[in-house]
Regions:
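Core register positions within helices of long alpha-helical scaffolds
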Residues: 59, 110-113, 153, 199, ...
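An N-terminal, globular interaction/scaffold subdomain
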Residues: 29-116
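Eukaryote-skewed repeat-based solenoidal scaffolds used as protein-protein interaction platforms
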Residues: 85-235, 247, 256-263
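Compact integral membrane and secretory-pathway proteins
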Residues: 40, 81, 105-107, 111, ...
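Terminal, non-catalytic domain-edge segments
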Residues: 1-66, 130, 135, 174, ...
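Extracellular glycan-recognition/adhesion modules and their associated mucin-like linkers
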Residues: 45-49, 237-241, 245
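Amphipathic alpha-helical protein-interaction segments enriched in hydrophobic
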Residues: 231-242, 296-304
Length: 436
């Protein structure tokens, strides 16, 4: 998976993702039944094959918009269009549309994207129209971000004239309509956040009326980055970083730091390790087996890296943040890093952090605050929560979701202490009465 991974520029990383897509699509032809859904096991389930084809089409959709930056992007896009077309319009897809009309748009993701890119298939469009109409009243219950996906696919398929019924209500119910839980959110919560934004914005090509201010959504994205970086979930880091180019916003210091982390790992390994990647398993393998393991466990992370770099190119390609740290932040990073426990030296992101200048470290102090507070809360260490909030007050970092929610946590903790103290007093009084 090395092809272009060592290229320092965004174009090289887009090319790398497209080369990986070509290899993944070629692997489908060699698919054999696997032992379950684990993508680390050789072979692909039918649903996994559909996922690869759909995500490959999404990668092409993003990369096509950046093709004017380098002719090699167009060449790589053209190389994968053919295999995508073959799978997107196969007999299996036709059968799935007819048998499962309630999920017609999901079955036709790659077909719809190809049509949008100028590769139509009128006959399959006719069948899709029939099946989609038949399935309108059936199909699965969908979470808000999946409802937004349906609207995104409808827009791609039908163009700008197709209305988005109830979009505002769906956005309000989605993760874009509420503050992310800085301490209790899971990977799936962050996934719902990133995908709601992908679909609502058409991967950055559309500006919907969002239910909250952009600044609030960006704060949530930075909170999500703290979680993803601290768990070393680089696939998720890349997804969250899509927030900035999709909203057309300059990259924040936290976002730039996270991107540096991704590129450092990708350049060291030759690919970006995915969520299912286990270094110990990878290191046991050699040759083709090792390359296949890296490909199948990490293709998605590298696709998302391709999305990210393509969208960044479309927005001008500037990732470097040159703004000096606010004077109020000076010294915040040193104070916060001291609050991380003895495992600090083994933190996955620590090497990138230590490579920063003191001024750069202070610029990412909101990220450090979020990491420290989440670790302290989940470890039950309210003393560290208090100390971290004291640093936040001193350096004017109190506006982040992590700080606000940590302060609320301490207030609830004080109530709990008083509640149990009162209960203990009541029990003591009851014992005295019984003795008397």
């Amino acid at each position: 998976m090395r092809e272009h991974a060592r290229s320092p520029d965004l174009v090289g990383r887009v090319l790398n993702a497209l080369h990986i897509a070509a290899r993944m699509l070629a692997s489908i032809d060699e698919a054999r039944p696997s032992r379950g859904d684990d993508p680390g096991i050789r072979g692909f389930q039918a649903t996994y094959r559909d996922k690869i084809v759909a995500e490959s089409a999404m990668l092409v959709l993003c990369a096509k918009g950046a093709a004017h930056h380098d002719r090699r992007i167009s060449e790589c896009v053209d190389a994968v269009i053919g295999p995508i077309n073959r799978f997107a319009r196969s007999e299996q897809v036709v059968s799935a549309l007819c048998v499962d009309p309630g999920r017609a748009l999901e079955h036709a993701v790659a077909h719809i994207i190809l049509g949008r890119l100028g590769y139509p298939d009128a006959k399959l469009d006719q069948l899709l129209s029939l099946c989609h109409a038949s399935g309108a009243g059936v199909g699965p219950e969908r979470l808000p971000h999946r409802q937004l996906e349906q609207q995104w696919l409808a827009r791609l398929w039908g163009g700008a004239h197709r209305p988005d019924h109830g979009e505002r209500s769906i956005l309000v119910q989605s993760m874009l309509g509420r503050t992310l839980d800085a301490f209790g959110s899971s990977r799936l919560d962050v996934y719902a956040f990133t995908h709601a934004l992908m679909y609502a914005t058409d991967f950055g090509d559309r500006r919907p009326r969002l239910p909250r201010k952009l600044s609030a959504i960006v704060l949530d994205a930075e909170t999500a980055l703290a979680f993803a970086l601290d768990t070393d979930d680089l696939d998720l880091v890349a997804e969250v970083l899509l927030t900035w180019p999709m909203l057309g916003l300059p990259w924040s210091p936290t976002a730039v730091f996270a991107f540096r982390r991704l590129t450092a790992v990708a350049d060291e390994r030759g690919f970006l390790p995915g969520y299912n990647f286990v270094a110990a398993e990878y290191d046991k393998l050699t040759g083709d087996e090792q390359r296949q393991y890296a490909l199948v466990t990490s293709y998605h992370a590298n696709y998302v890296m391709g999305f990210l770099c393509a969208l960044a190119l479309r927005r001008g390609g500037t990732l470097t943040d040159s703004v000096s740290a606010d004077r109020r932040y000076r010294g915040a990073a040193a104070a916060l890093i001291d609050l991380v426990d003895d495992a600090a030296e083994t933190l996955a992101w620590r090497r990138q952090f230590d490579a920063l200048t003191p001024d750069e470290q202070d610029r990412v102090s909101p990220l450090l605050l979020a990491i420290v507070l989440r670790r302290a809360k989940n470890g039950g260490d309210m003393r560290v929560v208090q100390h971290a909030l004291a640093v936040a007050v001193k350096h004017d970092l109190c506006g982040s979701p992590s700080a606000v929610q940590a302060a609320a946590l301490l207030r609830r903790g004080q109530f709990l202490v008083g509640y149990f103290a009162d209960r203990a007093t009541e029990r003591g009084s009851a014992v005295n009465v019984a003795v008397e």
